Amino acid sequence: MSEAITPTAMKTLFTEARTHNGWQEMPVSDETLREIYDLMKWGPTSANCSPARIVFVRTPEGKEKLRPSLSSGNLAKTLAAPVTAIIAWDSEFYERLPELFPHGDARSWFTSSPALAEETAFRNSAMQAAYLIFACRALGLDTGPMSGFDRQKVDEAFFTGTTLKSNLLINIGYGDFSKVYGRLPRLSFEDACGLV
């Protein structure tokens, strides 16, 4: 049985963590990005399918390439963030299943059903995006996930000629708490959950 994490760790990961809109002028190293991935990759996915593919946009040239796809409300904070992660999903993720899930012929589950493959890739890449957020928090970084962007423009700019499709964007860095909005409410257990 696993041990519960400390109350301090719970605050870091959940109750005191915030979505950030402003950033300190502190770089995020490539080594730190590797650490983030090396933590998040252990999060579970269906049949270990691991469909997420990530582009860490961290150069001025990369940000300019991303700029046309951003909504007006997300433009300034994304250009200012040290890193923006494009979380994409590989539409042919199943080609890696003989390596990732050697217990059976999982590849055939998806080659025989394109709809199932797409649903699985999209759902599980979204789960992996959440793991990335928690990996960042565990390493002392802050995040700002976003869906306010033009997916087609991102795909054309970054993934033309590949099997990748964008899912969401996550700004990563060291947040400026002076620019954090007031804490918003969450649904109660009674509003969000049922017991059967």
UniProtKB/Swiss-Prot annotation:
Its cofactor is FMN. Keywords: Flavoprotein, FMN, NAD, NADP, Oxidoreductase. The keyword Flavoprotein applies. SUPFAM superfamilies: FMN-dependent nitroreductase-like. Its EC number is 1.1.1.298. CDD domains: RutE-like. One of its GO terms (molecular function) is 3-hydroxypropionate dehydrogenase (NADP+) activity. It catalyses: 3-hydroxypropanoate + NADP(+) = 3-oxopropanoate + NADPH + H(+). Gene3D superfamilies: NADH Oxidase. InterPro entries: Nitroreductase, Nitroreductase-like, Nitroreductase_HadB/RutE, RutE-like. GO terms for biological process: nitrogen utilization; uracil catabolic process. Belongs to the nitroreductase family. HadB/RutE subfamily. May reduce toxic product malonic semialdehyde to 3-hydroxypropionic acid, which is excreted. This is Probable malonic semialdehyde reductase RutE.
